[in-house]
Curated annotation (Swiss-Prot):
Gene that produces this protein: fhaB
Gene Ontology CC: one annotated term: plasma membrane
Protein name, per record: FHA domain-containing protein FhaB
Residue positions, PTM Phosphothreonine: 36
Taxonomy of the source species: Bacteria, Bacillati, Actinomycetota, Actinomycetes, Mycobacteriales
Organism: Mycolicibacterium smegmatis (strain ATCC 700084 / mc(2)155)
Keyword Cell membrane: yes
Alphabetic keyword roster: Cell membrane, Membrane, Phosphoprotein, Transmembrane, Transmembrane helix
PANTHER family: NUCLEAR INHIBITOR OF PROTEIN PHOSPHATASE-1 (PTHR23308)
Transmembrane segments: 6-28
Domain FHA: 83-132
CDD domains in UniProt: FHA_FhaB-like
Xref: Gene3D superfamilies: 2.60.200.20
Subcellular location: Cell membrane
Post-translational changes noted in the entry: Phosphorylated by PknB. Dephosphorylated by PstP.
PROSITE patterns: FHA_DOMAIN
Length: 155
């Protein structure tokens, strides 16, 4: 009887070990082969520019600046195209950060405002210490943390 219990315990332990290995490989696979677009985003209500004072409306983000991390000091001039951020070679801002995913986040313009959205990254994207779960408006000067890299929008 004791031999049977010992054998069942060994088999159960091996099954748990293989289940753990399978889940780790599945997570790595989804991070490596993450979709390039087509991310479902719930849109919230945005504050319209007409409600802001005139002096705040004049400040339009024109540059993306890396303030912390390996690429500190890097500046990207913003246009009308979204900025893809991640470790992929075809990203607009290619990060050499171990905590960043291949396709980590996207900064998208909507009128004169910029929104950040996480593209299903493993470690998440943070705006002012708050985790980004949907497309969120990025105020000028607010830190956006992607792994060890921090970026800001500047006028």
């Amino acid at each position: 009887m004791q031999g049977l219990v010992l054998q069942l315990t060994r088999v159960g332990f091996l099954l748990l070990l293989w289940l753990f290995i399978w889940s780790v490989l599945r997570i790595l696979r989804t991070d490596i082969y993450a979709p390039t677009g087509a991310v479902m985003v719930r849109r919230g209500l945005a504050l319209r520019g007409s409600l802001l004072p005139n002096r705040q409306r004049r400040h339009v983000a024109r540059q993306l600046v890396v303030t912390e991390g390996a690429l500190a000091g890097t500046r990207i001039t913003l246009g009308n195209q979204p900025v893809l951020i991640g470790r992929a070679d075809d990203s607009t801002l290619v990060l050499t950060d171990d905590y960043a995913s291949t396709r980590h986040a996207r900064l998208s313009p909507r009128g004169s405002e910029w929104y950040v959205e996480d593209l299903g990254s493993t470690n998440g994207t943070y705006l002012d210490r708050a985790k980004v779960t949907t497309a969120v408006k990025v105020p000028i000067g607010a830190p956006v943390r992607i792994g060890k890299t921090v970026i800001e929008l500047r006028p």
